[in-house]
Design a protein with these regions (language model features):
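Active-site-proximal catalytic alpha-helix in oxidoreductases
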Residues: 1-17, 21-36
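NAD(P)-dependent Rossmann-like dehydrogenase/reductase catalytic/cofactor-binding core
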Residues: 25-146
């Protein structure tokens, strides 16, 4: 889930994992994504070194804390940016509709709310259109409403 969060914030992955708000956003995105996938009977493979069922249970306080701890431990792993953030930096269109936009549309089709994927998709589309700029403020704005 680092792809859109890095693109939104213009932060490297190691910096994302060092920030509580960006870790929270990654966890919420992963939770919605796995819940949609499981409802669609998709075999969601582990990602980020973590089993899909754990991401699906991120709404439980103890599970959320463990996920947050795991992500925080990945801080300092290098100053790299995933493909979507590189697209933003180079002014290329992103793959947001094939990723988070897909989760949002599939969620709607099966009655699962995906408010975090919805807003992230909209904001990345606005970045693609150059209506807003990538900034950590984007993450803060999303988290203030969640």
């Amino acid at each position: 889930m680092t792809n859109p969060v890095s693109a939104l914030s213009d932060m490297s992955v190691s910096n994302l994992n060092g920030n509580q708000s960006s870790r929270q956003l990654q966890i919420l995105l992963a939770n919605e994504t796995v819940r949609v996938g499981k409802r669609l009977k998709i075999d969601v493979v582990p990602f980020g070194g973590i089993e899909a069922d754990i991401w699906a249970d991120a709404g439980q306080k103890n599970v959320y804390k463990e996920l947050d701890r795991i992500l925080a431990e990945k801080t300092g792993g290098g100053d790299w940016r995933p493909s979507m953030a590189q697209d933003v930096l180079k002014g290329r269109p992103t793959e947001i509709m094939q990723m988070n936009g897909f989760v949002s549309s599939q969620g709607k089709s099966i009655g699962i709310n995906t408010p975090i994927n919805d807003v992230v998709t909209k904001m990345i589309m606005d970045i693609d259109k150059r209506l807003i700029k990538p900034s950590f403020t984007n993450i803060e704005n999303i988290m203030s409403f969640s």
